[in-house]
Amino acid sequence: MILNSLSLCYHNKLILAPMVRVGTLPMRLLALDYGADIVYCEELIDLKMIQCKRVVNEVLSTVDFVAPDDRVVFRTCEREQNRVVFQMGTSDAERALAVARLVENDVAGIDVNMGCPKQYSTKGGMGAALLSDPDKIEKILSTLVKGTRRPVTCKIRILPSLEDTLSLVKRIERTGIAAIAVHGRKREERPQHPVSCEVIKAIADTLSIPVIANGGSHDHIQQYSDIEDFRQATAASSVMVARAAMWNPSIFLKEGLRPLEEVMQKYIRYAVQYDNHYTNTKYCLCQMLREQLESPQGRLLHAAQSSREICEAFGLGAFYEETTQELDAQQARLSAKTSEQTGEPAEDTSGVIKMAVKFDRRAYPAQITPKMCLLEWCRREKLAQPVYETVQRPLDRLFSSIVTVAEQKYQSTLWDKSKKLAEQAAAIVCLRSQGLPEGRLGEESPSLHKRKREAPDQDPGGPRAQELAQPGDLCKKPFVALGSGEESPLEGW
């Protein structure tokens, strides 16, 4: 058995709840700024996490857990290391332990989601589906408690009867977990249903471990003082806040809520500093604006198709330029240092225009790439076709490409995992140095529209179409009025 070290205290704490799409690094840091004691990341599925590699990101000063497709699944930093709890979705004890061991050196605690009622969680036997399988719950939690260095917790919903609920939580307590978070609603209930404070209180009276009360955002928590009132009503050790914190993270501030625009600007700064993908940034800002989405500010946010445009919508254009330039410069310095350490032969690159850029497929429409934009521009200007020269570095098998256009060479200082990606990066350098659009979402060249229309038809409901539609859809319907009978993306959190 591995003894848990650096135990996180769950007594008398204000906690940011795990929330899908919301609990990424910028929101967690913002909640800490405003007074949260502990912050949970969004639920991350074990099957996805066990494919990830741990990468130290020296540019951002973060630790990233990166999927095989190079997407960052989980990002954390030193500032939250002793206060962030990693929540996983799992239905298998061994997978859960593998994930816990992967992240345990970078987080303060490990939590298992046993309360999410959404189909994407329950269909895999995760989330609230676990509530009907106490044996599996016991195996998962016992395995984690014995096998990881961090305190283990779980988050549940209440069962149809108080007797069954108390029986379950007593069995959970015997696994040796450090605390239990209780969402005071049944699996089938939604935010418009009242939270059962009396059931949480009965659980708190029954257990000796800390009980964390959750589910009071709509009925109970409108301001800071309400958090303590909710804690007393449930007799809980601590309170976990979800929606109220999503709407305005300064709910944790003892001095009272800060103006929303101030909060949003602070959130955006973190999002830029930590390279948060703009679709996630946009989603979180939409949750904060809520009824104000039809305001001038809301319309600007709705139209934004990049982090730069989001910053400009909130008067942070200069901050974006300054920050991204600093990050690019840091990346260039690190790349140069890496080249020296790998012992690459020095080559004459005088006259080569260089930038630290990478090609991110998610930032471009399905039928448009920087290489296509560059080729189209060369044809329009009656220039020879771009010529790409690509080399592979033997040590790590990464690629770098130089593109020649009108006798001028362009190159990204960042090495890529494939020849195609390296060529796209070189094309971006050329386009940016010429002040030309590179085809990103929201800045497509009109001359390419015909080519897009002539491309083979794609399934309008396919995964890529849904991905591209997502940001706008999220802003059009960022939340559901409680009592409407409809479900919000955040149900169960």
UniProtKB/Swiss-Prot annotation:
GO terms for biological process: antiviral innate immune response; tRNA dihydrouridine synthesis. It is an enzyme of class 1 (oxidoreductase). Residues 369-436 form the DRBM domain. Residues 1-333 are annotated as: Catalytic domain. InterPro entries: Aldolase_TIM, dsRBD_dom, DUS-like_FMN-bd, DUS2_DSRM, tRNA-DUS-like, tRNA_hU_synthase_CS. Weak expression in heart, placenta and skeletal muscle. Up-regulated in most lung cancer cells (at protein level). One of its GO terms (molecular function) is tRNA dihydrouridine synthase activity. Coiled coil: none annotated. It catalyses: 5,6-dihydrouridine(20) in tRNA + NADP(+) = uridine(20) in tRNA + NADPH + H(+). The modification Phosphoserine is found at residues 445, 488. Its cofactor is FMN. Residues 367-371, 420-424 are annotated as: Interaction with tRNA. Catalyzes the NADPH-dependent synthesis of dihydrouridine, a modified base found in the D-loop of most tRNAs. Specifically modifies U20 in cytoplasmic tRNAs. Activity depends on the presence of guanosine at position 19 in the tRNA substrate. Negatively regulates the activation of EIF2AK2/PKR. Efficient dihydrouridine synthesis requires the presence of both the catalytic domain and the C-terminal RNA-binding DRBM domain. This is tRNA-dihydrouridine(20) synthase [NAD(P)+]-like.
